[in-house]
Swiss-Prot record:
Coiled coil: none annotated. This is Potassium-transporting ATPase potassium-binding subunit. The lineage of its organism: Bacteria, Bacillati, Bacillota, Bacilli, Bacillales. Belongs to the KdpA family. It is a multi-pass membrane protein. InterPro entries: KdpA (IPR004623). It comes from the Bacteria. HAMAP family: KdpA (MF_00275). The chain crosses the membrane at residues 2-22, 60-80, 130-150, 173-193, 246-266, 278-298, 374-394, 412-432, 483-503, 525-545. It is found in: Cell membrane. It comes from Bacillus cereus (strain B4264). Signal peptide: none annotated.
Length: 555
């Protein structure tokens, strides 16, 4: 029965992807999508803010994005620092320590949601609502806006206006869908209140304080925007965030909704729907491979316990919630790292070595399917690399969407693809070379190495999940992961927008019999191979020293 539920969940992922992709294309291309509802609201926002609907250059678009995001980071930083004297603080929580406030503000603006604090004890209701939830809408709206400009550039059209795209992302995508999802979560038992904690009497007569809050509205945008941060420290393992299997499936659907839709949006916007379909199918195959690998490993259990003759029919149950089980915990771990969300319904630090390898690889590749917007930019980056390599092998000038791929584009892509592993491996080496980093490690040996690399991988990929055995709430970890999150977020977005702008200016080369097609299964295979090979060449030595070595040791 459990496998039937898994298959149905997978089918739901597939069934909602195309309609959502069609809706996104219409919403951002000026087609009518509930204009009577959203149009007046958007015009009012433009009038109040003074936004004018004109086309920007790629530099203007990128500058608008960075300045708006930077302003939001500063505002939210001071909210966190001053929450102790601000209203909506029934628990009388004090202001955040400076480096933690720095880390948290960047974390949520970068759509990472890395949390070095426990949500219910670290933030007031004002900080949760005005600080965290606000950024949970703003962060994915930023990248969804940018990816639309990116696709327009690839299609040879004007990039558009960042502020217009940002507003449409909020009004036509995130606000309505998150509102409906929040109502469903309330119906499923997720609390939504501004009241403080309640005191309950336990069976043995003791008193217990039960924390609550505006959780349903928080969880809906947490998953839809691929944010992932928890209202509670336990994240989606907490019964108030994720009461049962229905809420669990809904959370996974929200996580996958926009990342899986964007390939179809792309296909429609560039005028070749097959392009989108082949990307969707190729990435879904990689996703399935990851799910099968982690599930098999977790169902086989811990090799160390197997050697003791201990039977565990449910597989490796450590760190998992009984109400979800091993299979759905494995699926959730695959989804949350494939969609770069970072929400967890099981503790990733307790996964088996190979089970923990899958989330790590998903984040290192950062492209299966990746988070809202940013992930799709990485997908196209790998697609262009695949075209470039194929062109070199047959002695032709590489072409993508009828545009020649030349030195300028490849230099930008080369720098971008190297920057991701440089952040991860460089900062991991720094942490491992100083007591400021190693003092936080709770496990020695191979697993300790994986803890460190996982933290920086999660930060660079804007995922936010963690091996929570790492004691990371220190100035060193707060500052270094904050820098990694900021650089990992904005560097690739800006460089790839420059690539799209460069391709926009090029004339379309007529298609001939020798043109390498990018809308068939051959390209799909080369595309997958490029992702795997580039990822393996970059990160394989670290994976051997970490999870693979741990697995072989336990065996």
């Amino acid at each position: 029965m459990i496998w039937v539920a898994v298959i149905i969940t997978m089918l739901l992922f597939i069934l909602v992807a195309k309609p959502t992709g069609v809706y996104l294309e219409k919403a951002f291309q000026g087609s009518k999508t509930l204009d009577k509802v959203f149009g007046p609201f958007e015009k009012l926002i433009f009038k109040i803010t003074g936004v004018k609907e004109y086309n920007q250059t790629w530099k203007q678009y990128a500058l608008s994005l960075v300045l708006l995001n930077g302003f939001m980071i500063v505002v939210v930083y001071f909210i966190f620092r001053l929450q102790g004297v601000l209203p909506l603080n029934p628990a009388h929580i004090e202001g955040m320590e400076p480096t933690l406030a720095f880390n948290t503000a960047i974390s949520f603006m970068a759509d990472t949601n890395l949390q070095h604090y426990s949500g219910e004890n670290g933030l007031s209701y004002l900080s949760q609502l005005i600080g965290i939830t606000f950024l949970m809408f703003a962060a994915p709206a930023t990248t969804l806006a940018l990816v639309m400009a990116f696709i327009r550039g690839l299609a040879g059209k004007e990039l558009g206006n960042f502020f217009v795209d940002f507003t449409r992302a909020l009004t036509r995508v995130f606000l309505p869908i998150a509102f409906i999802a929040a109502l469903v979560f309330v119906a499923l038992g997720v609390p939504q209140t501004l009241d403080g904690a309640v005191t309950a009497q336990t069976i043995d007569g003791a008193k217990q304080s039960i924390l609550r809050g505006p959780v349903a509205s928080f969880v809906s945008i947490k998953e839809l925007g691929n944010n992932g941060g928890g209202f509670f420290g336990a994240n989606s393992t907490h019964p108030f965030e994720n009461p049962g299997q229905m809420s669990n499936i809904l959370q996974m659907m929200l996580m996958m909704l926009l990342p899986t839709a964007l390939p179809f949006t792309y296909g429609r916007m560039v005028g070749n729907k097959k392009q989108g379909r082949i990307l969707f199918v190729s990435l879904f195959m990689v996703f399935l491979l990851g799910f099968i690998t982690i599930t098999t490993s977790e169902l086989n259990g811990n090799p160390a316990l197997n050697g003791m003759g201990i039977e565990h029919v449910q597989g490796s149950a450590e760190g998992k919630e009984v109400r979800f089980g091993t299979v759905f915990s494995s699926l959730y771990a695959t989804v949350t790292t494939a969609a770069e969300t970072g929400a967890v319904n099981t503790m990733h630090d307790t996964l088996t070595p190979i089970g923990g390898l899958v989330p790590l690889v998903n984040m290192m590749l950062n492209t299966v399917y990746g988070g809202v917007g940013a992930g799709f930019v990485n997908i196209i980056m790998y697609a262009i690399i695949a075209v470039f390599i194929s062109g070199l092998m047959v002695g032709r000038t590489p072409e993508f969407l009828g545009k020649k791929i030349e030195g300028k584009e490849m230099k930008l892509i080369a720098v971008t693809i190297l920057f991701h592993p440089l952040l991860i491996l460089g900062f991991s080496a720094l942490a491992l070379s100083t007591n400021l980093g190693t003092d936080a490690i709770s496990h020695s040996g191979f697993h300790g190495l994986t803890q460190v690399v996982y933290e920086y991988t999660s930060s660079a990929a804007n995922n936010g999940s963690g091996f929570e055995g790492l004691g990371d709430n220190t100035p060193f970890w707060n500052i270094t992961t904050g820098l990694v999150m900021f650089l990992g977020r904005y560097f690739s977005l800006i460089t790839m927008l420059a690539v799209a702008a460069s391709l926009k200016e090029k004339t379309v080369v007529p298609e001939t019999v020798g043109t390498f097609r990018t809308d068939n299964s051959l390209f799909g295979g080369i595309f997958i191979g490029t992702i795997v090979i580039v990822g393996a060449l970059t990160f394989f030595p670290m994976l051997v020293l970490g999870p693979i070595a741990e697995f072989l040791t336990l065996k």
